[in-house]
UniProtKB/Swiss-Prot annotation:
Name assigned to this protein: UDP-galactose transporter homolog 1
Topology of this chain in the membrane: Multi-pass membrane protein
Gene: hut1
Positions with biased composition (Polar residues): 9-33
Functional description taken from the UniProt entry: May be involved in specific transport of UDP-Gal from the cytosol to the Golgi lumen. Involved in the maintenance of optimal conditions for the folding of secretory pathway proteins in the endoplasmic reticulum.
Organism this protein belongs to: Aspergillus fumigatus (strain ATCC MYA-4609 / CBS 101355 / FGSC A1100 / Af293) (Neosartorya fumigata)
Molecular function via GO: UDP-galactose transmembrane transporter activity; UDP-glucose transmembrane transporter activity
Assigned keywords, A-Z: Endoplasmic reticulum, Glycoprotein, Membrane, Sugar transport, Transmembrane, Transmembrane helix, Transport
Similarity section: Belongs to the nucleotide-sugar transporter family. SLC35B subfamily.
PANTHER family: SOLUTE CARRIER FAMILY 35 MEMBER B (PTHR10778), SOLUTE CARRIER FAMILY 35 MEMBER B1 (PTHR10778:SF10)
Amino acid sequence: MHLVPEGSESMSTQQNGSAQKPVTLNGSASTKGQAPEAPLETPGLIQLAICVLGIYASFLSWGVLQEAITTVNFPVRPPTAEEPNPPTERFTFSIVLNTIQSTFAAITGFLYLYFSTPAGKKVPSIFPTRKILFPLLLVSISSSLASPFGYASLAHIDYLTFILAKSCKLLPVMFLHLTIFRKTYPLYKYGVVLLVTLGVATFTLHHPGTSKKVAASAAKNQSGSSLYGIFLLSINLLLDGLTNTTQDHVFSSPQIYTRFTGPQMMVAQNILSTILTTTYLLVMPHLSSTGALHALLPIPIPPSTETELASAVSFLSRHPEVMKNVLGFAACGAIGQLFIFYTLSRFSSLLLVTVTVTRKMLTMLLSVFWFGHTLSAGQWLGIGLVFGGIGAEAVVQKREKQSKEQAKALTGKKE
């Protein structure tokens, strides 16, 4: 999911439980002729606990279902005496999965936007200006292309490598900000990137133990297959970075695109993504009946005489238990997004980053115990470097924020 870029918390009207006071042109608060405003309710520990538990429950379940959908093999037909071990197949229909996910997210995002709008006020437009269509379309295309590359990489690397690399989005985001948007970073952020890169390299070089269920088949072509999987995952991360940097640009440019909030981005991006992927599923088979066009597209889907949609429906009819996982996956992702946006509007972004980073760590640990993965000391060192770097960034950001608040308080006293 690519819906909460850094900095979008500035678009909310309330943060850390406080609201901005109305200010006149001379900079003083306007109170003449008005009744004193009632203090807004400060979000308490109960709300914080609900948000944290909601994010953990939604995305831990989402992660388990994602691994179950994309890595578990199912027999093509029931075993018999003549064929006790029939061939197996795996759910590889990433665009179908992406379409279901974006549909659920668009619906839940719209419901959130509708019911969170105060009574008597108009629901904010999903596409407020024409200028915003291009960056939103770019976000939808990059996010729609990113998922197939990510899911395709799971055929060559295990889920733990996938999750650890997905925790390193700082790398492509920083690269694209430096090259496209000419944005500079403080020195400590480059140190964080170095730690994260060393952690990923350490974890990858000490190739993680595969699941007990697929260890025999994975050992046959481990080295070359893993390199190809890392290549696919690198493309996925680059597209994720393009998605996030474009979102940052939209949120930080209200003078160009008008004020645009997180829920609006959630709905708009998922609607456009659903339209794009549905069009692909319905139109592309008629344009590529021989599979030649598939080979030219930058999407790692092997050519097939069947359409992906028809193949996915056929797979789900043979394995109806997977359909439950797919629907649960989409629902957990959509609900998780709602908790993220609520947390972003009621608390600080630093808290949200802390919650999501620890959630990713718990996802990895849950994967270890749930699916029988094993980790060596080298892999644990890699994990420690990655999350140590991200944790150090959170500490520095907290100190910077405290320094800014103290400086602001001193300035206010002088005035």
